[in-house]
């Protein structure tokens, strides 16, 4: 396995990193995107369709290419956080964080004592990194609470200021709904724009990276706003857009139309 580059060190150096958001189960999709130049992949166990075994295989596929695999867990719960880290995830994104106490619980779940309360038992990752994993995990694993609720937005300074939090990820869909807007990127709407500025400013004050679920159209704006961890596609979106482009091109060249 090629050694994965530390995302935390890249963020600390001011680098912008681009990733692919994986929602479909199985290692093949990860293998397909892992040689394209992405800086990381995210395995989405919250809204994606994979179980734990499939997520483990996806992490392993990323490992083979030396691509950092981050997992969005279904919930901020110590059991599943520990399991995805034991599988080899190099970062954990936790959804629906409400308070600084929630974020502190996430840090505790991701860090071995004396920093946190993670249980030691890296069954799979131990075969990858050997006995030294226990001494490097606290420094290598990225802890990323999501800012996507009104409560988290109100407490963003306290959340990102916590020792052990490495980045905050803006969830534009849930955040928009929390602000009374339709789900999605609502740039140009004052409430949404102000929320983005608030999160970015808080992360800068505390020296933390700021992340976001995005797409190829909006990503350049997010770079300009100061985001450093930006997803530019999901596997489902990439499959749909590429399939549609191929189908449209063939129909245009052959003069055929959609059935029905």
UniProtKB/Swiss-Prot annotation:
The keyword Nuclease does not apply. Its cofactor is a divalent metal cation. The keyword Lyase applies. It catalyses: D-glyceraldehyde + pyruvate = 2-dehydro-3-deoxy-L-galactonate. PANTHER family: 2-KETO-3-DEOXY-L-RHAMNONATE ALDOLASE, PHOSPHOENOLPYRUVATE CARBOXYLASE FAMILY PROTEIN. Aldolase which can catalyze in vitro the aldolisation reaction between hydroxypyruvate (HPA) or pyruvate (PA) and D-glyceraldehyde (D-GA). The condensation of pyruvate and D-glyceraldehyde produces 2-dehydro-3-deoxy-L-galactonate. Has weak activity with hydroxypyruvate and D-glyceraldehyde. Belongs to the HpcH/HpaI aldolase family. This is Hydroxypyruvate/pyruvate aldolase. It comes from Parvibaculum lavamentivorans (strain DS-1 / DSM 13023 / NCIMB 13966).
